[in-house]
Regions:
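Short, solvent-exposed coil/turn elements at secondary-structure transition points
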Residues: 35-37, 102-105, 133
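Short beta-strand element of Class I
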Residues: 1-4, 72
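C-terminal lobe and adjacent flexible extensions of AdoMet/dcAdoMet transferase-like proteins
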Residues: 130-136
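C-terminal substrate-binding/active-site "lid" region of AdoMet-derived donor-dependent transferases
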Residues: 56-126
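S-adenosyl-L-methionine
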Residues: 4-55
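Short, glycine/serine-rich, charged loops/turns that create anion-binding
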Residues: 10, 79, 134
Length: 136
């Protein structure tokens, strides 16, 4: 198998290429520079992972290359984006649509006790998972 990456920015694509080469994974990786909203992959893929501000706008094109029964994952940083993505997936008939919040917060650890830090410096992000139906 191979991982196909689509990066809209050439500078990010070059950074990704350096990281993949450094990790020794080049034989298993294919880089495309372009916009996932309209790029032609020329192949069907088993899974898609998107990290972009408006992933719901890419779903029409994702449907062209994500095989039936394939898995979808998306990362978005705010709740309004979760709504757009989840609604977009449901509108297309995707199954098992799940949205999860990932919260990172510091813990106070002392002998005899562990509790969350009272400082409210937390970072959150949302992961959305779904499966394309086996038949459209």
């Amino acid at each position: 198998g191979k991982v196909v990456s689509v990066e809209v920015r050439d500078d990010f694509a070059q950074r990704a290429r350096r990281n993949v080469v450094r990790a020794g994974l080049s034989p298993y990786w294919d880089l495309r520079v372009g916009d996932v909203k309209g790029i032609e992959l020329g192949m069907a893929v088993d899974a898609v992972a998107l990290d972009m501000p408006d992933p719901w706008q890419a779903l029409d094109n994702v449907d062209r290359f994500l095989r039936p029964g394939g898995h979808f994952a998306g990362f978005v940083p705010n709740a309004n984006q979760v709504e757009g993505l989840v609604c977009g997936l449901r509108d297309r008939g995707y199954l098992e649509v799940v949205a999860l919040e990932n919260i990172q917060r510091s813990m106070e650890v002392h002998p005899g006790g562990v509790r969350p830090s009272y400082e409210n410096l937390a970072h959150t992000g949302y992961l959305v998972f779904a499966r394309r139906p086996s038949r459209d």
